Amino acid sequence: MGMKAVIMAGGEGRRLKAVTGELPKPMVPLLGKPLMERTVELLRENGITDICATLGYNPAPILSHFGGGEDFGVHLSWRIEDKPLGTAGGVKNCMDFIGDEPFLVLSGDAACDFDLHRLADEHARSGAAVTMALYESPDPLRYGLVVPDADGSVRCFIEKPPWERVVTNLVNTGIYVIEPRAMELVPEGESFDFASDLFPKLMDAG
């Protein structure tokens, strides 16, 4: 798969700070490997080797571990934020890397095992500006939920609802295939998130 990917790796991991200290969340180990290394492996296993990562909090350990990606069978470039830009704002910083083809976005601080080819194929079939991977959660109270229509388009988002508002258990995984045209709605140099800012704008635009 010739698609490029952006890894969002700027997270501080405040809830883990008592355990991890100053270590950035993407470098938190899981079974002996940093979380972000598992994301890089997932991309490589799916044939994606051209990767850009957005960095914010304490980037030095990440840069030291990964370098240019040669030791991991990929090519890694970096965009370091001077101030927090949010998920979409950070990815906007990578548009010179992305070019004019659909691209993949993943989190660098969450481990998953996912068929990225299937997601890319569904995106190509749908003609959507954004295609997101969803997960059926056994504990929907903890996450932002996505309510789809019958055709697979998004009807609405519900952020960490109480039980009486739980109408689905489908969770936004933070894994997306995005058309570059969708990123035109993201302002340059401003904090802007996918779930709370960009996706509602896309829904309003139809």
Question: At which residue positions do the language-model features occur?
Answer:
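Acidic/His-rich active-site region of diverse nucleotide-sugar glycosyltransferases
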Residues: G86-A88, Y143-E159
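Histidine-centered beta-alpha loop that forms part of the nucleotide-sugar donor binding/catalytic region
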Residues: G10, G56, Y135-E136
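A structural signal for short hydrophobic beta-strand segments in well-ordered beta-sheet cores
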Residues: M27, L145-P148, F199
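Conserved N-terminal catalytic core of the sugar/cofactor nucleotidyltransferase
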Residues: M1-I7, R15, P29-S107, A111, ...
